[in-house]
Amino acid sequence: MYTCPKTCTLTLKFFIDRFHTDYRLSKLAISFFDQKKNKMADSIPVKKKGSAKGPPSFVTPEYIEKQRQKKLEKMAKKAARKPIAPPSNAPPEFNTDFIKREMLSIPNYAPFETEKSALDITIMTYNVLAQTNIRRSMFPHSGEALKWKNRSRMLANELTYYSPTLGCMQEVDAEFVPNFYKKLLGGLGYELHFIKGEGKTHGIMIFWKSSLFKKVQDLTIYYDDHDELPGRMNTKNIGCCVRLERVDDPSRGLFLATTHLFWHPYGSYERLRQGAILVKEVNKMAQSHPSWPVFIAGDFNTEPFDTNFPALTTRPLSICQRATDIIERSMNYVFGESELEEKNASTKTENDSNEDDKEECQSSSTSSVPESTASTPKKRILHVQNDYVPHYRSFYQQHEQNPVLFSLYSVGYKLVHPENAKNTFDHPAFTNWAHAYQGHLDYIFVMNRDTSLQTPENQVVEGIKLKALLRVPLPSEMKEAEPLEGRYPSDHVALMANVQIV
């Protein structure tokens, strides 16, 4: 047992002072214990380096630095365990989540027989809102949701979640294709085909799962260059189509086309023409494989009651009086140069009058078309039209020669969501929810290539069954104009159909 020499000396001194008054005896005793203390101190074993914690026999600068570093590391670990509260004035992190919608199954669906090697696929169409078209006056409630750094993350989350087999996009910014769309879609297992009209900053895109399909042909349709059905003016709109072979069986495949038709509220005449050209050219391309399915999906800027829709989907043509009135007013309308620009880019700034904004941003509905051409503002009479303007009936003739198209949402949505299938031809109320306009503009069509065949029961056309449709929100579920944080990244909502093909 080790006893401190200093403690012993003090104890003895106290005892002698109290009980023995002889000074010499006290001095002698204290001297003896001082010597004993020194010997005991010398006999304490020296601790080996590293055998226990504590300072060395003498402190060096290296030792001090080492201890300082240990203390800093300990403080850093402790700080890492404590969450750092953001400054009270820091903005909250942007919510890149989105409203997830369910696929609604078609009742009484029955798959094809297994020996036919049927393939389940999903087809999406989505106008993703070009960044170059955005003006804040058009999206007064969108705030931070308009910034590409935020919208792009919402788009990425949405595409990853729905993961369609095939997809069509419109208003795809050309500048974002290499570093965003190709990287995102490539990472999700897609290949893509992108094309844009001359002088445009955005275009249209088709993408497909490379594990299932391989592109062997593509076609670009330039509506302005079509001399057989000349237009009144150049709009720079285009369409495109790809032929995709199945990886597991190259003798089988499909055709997929997309487009973005002329946007203007008074543009029904041009849309009727462009729709006729699109179906004609896609059908011509598809003649190489008569048994393959043909899908056409995109933003047609066409309400179901607009003239172009019944021209695409009824045989014989069934054009009601409302649609006839729309096309006649459109034919009589005279466009100005500025009206051929993009729909959002051409809108007025916040400093312009509200009346001008209203005039420029009307929707493609009968309420947006003047009752007579006399109401056309004189400032628009800037003759950009061609000298020869064919009558719209010539477009009807081309439509009648084309194969008929069936809208998959018109066919099936009333069966899965009847309370939201009250629009013309049983469509949902809207696919576009903007500030100045809300309506149904986007479609997924399938081409009926052989009208001489009677379509079997539970098939849309020969060899194609509709299995499910992506739910479209009710108007009552919507808020201000999209895009909005945590809701939708575009002013359009995506459509998607699940079909089985053989």
From Swiss-Prot:
GO terms for cellular component: cytoplasm; cytosol; nucleus. Keywords: Cytoplasm, Exonuclease, Hydrolase, Nuclease, Nucleus. Residues 341-351 have a biased composition (Basic and acidic residues). Residues 363-376 have a biased composition (Low complexity). It is an enzyme of class 3 (hydrolase). Pfam families: Exo_endo_phos. The keyword Nucleus applies. The keyword Methyltransferase does not apply. InterPro entries: CCR4/nocturin_mRNA_transcr, Endo/exonu/phosph_ase_sf, Endo/exonuclease/phosphatase. One of its GO terms (molecular function) is poly(A)-specific ribonuclease activity. One of its GO terms (biological process) is rRNA processing. It is found in: Cytoplasm; Nucleus. Its EC number is 3.1.-.-. Its main location: cytoplasm. Residues 338-379 are annotated as: Disordered. Belongs to the CCR4/nocturin family. PANTHER family: CARBON CATABOLITE REPRESSOR PROTEIN 4, NOCTURNIN. This is Probable RNA exonuclease C9B6.11c. It comes from Schizosaccharomyces pombe (strain 972 / ATCC 24843) (Fission yeast).
